[in-house]
């Protein structure tokens, strides 16, 4: 039975706060999620198992299994390679372009967990924001809205902020008659 993912962040120049933020974000991305627990007990899994294997769909046991049960999450449903790719992609979206992710499974008895080791490297930052220079009406409109930019010098590169800036400029241009 799969009990979840553990993420270890290895970085020389990371603050504890940043290391914790990376670890929590990566643990949230790892799939599949283990069976839910209430006070440390996998209650839904217990209900699923108590209903039995050969329960008819229309019986009370079948209803309990469907309504309150949750099938076990097995190690065979865990794709280490896919999770490695997802974690790597998210780190790159946060500006860690040279991050390394390695995953492995650890089996102890009937329980198994995935363990991911992340070496994020240096986080790239925005050195300078330049919207180009041109004498067209479009460039003039972009220059007018450039003062409210979401991209600031020395901020870490974040794909979400870059997309938000692109959408902000797009909305501004559409409000000013640029629809092409």
What are these regions (language model features)?
Residues 1-180:
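Interaction-mediating elements
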